Amino acid sequence: NALVHAVLTTGRNVGAFSSGTEGFFDRFDTPREMVEHEYEATERMREIGVNAPRPIDAFEVNGLGVLVLEYLPEFESLDDVSDAVIADRAAELFEMLSSLHEHGLAHGDLRAENILLSDGEFYFIDATSVHDDRADETTAYDLACALAVLEPRIGPRKAVDAATTAYAPSTLLSARAFLDFVRLRPDH
């Protein structure tokens, strides 16, 4: 729903301000705009080779945006994947995220529930909209979110080690600005 999205987007932008940068999350005026963006973002992820369920349709019903994605049989969200599997495959998540960033994309809402494991493959879902001209900040924010997702499961050292397989130390250090804000989010 667009109103809920607007409130959450405002909160994220306030968090970005508190981290010393301008807000970089876009908001949508209607539920349809919101799901059309997610449809397009999912298509773009797939075009660059990042696993994401194939988008089928986006529409509005009773004031709610509905995005229909391909069915992934027997998937687990990252919350339900064992710590051992996460530790073994954490570098893959950073490789996927790095691929987004290398192609001028960002996830913007990387949480455990937006990372799926299906048939041995990781998938990203629920990408949000960020300003195209803020690549450094959105990369740092995505990295902070990924580290916040992984750290409680595999520990800080293993999470950072996995991140170094895909990112330069200077890029990783830029994520520090967002760690306090990301820790405050109720979903991390």
Predicted regions and their residues:
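Conserved ATP-binding subdomain of kinase catalytic cores across diverse folds
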Residues: 1-70, 102
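A short, polar/proline- and glycine-enriched secondary-structure boundary/capping micro-motif
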Residues: 3-9, 79-80, 134-136
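Short intrinsically disordered coil segments
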Residues: 11-13, 83-87, 140
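Short, contiguous strand/loop micro-motifs
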Residues: 27-29, 83-84, 133
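Repeat-unit-sized solenoid/scaffold elements
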Residues: 57-92, 180-188
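Catalytic activation segment of kinase domains across protein kinase-like and atypical kinase folds
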Residues: 61-70, 76, 106-148
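C-lobe/activation-segment region of protein kinase-like
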Residues: 123-187
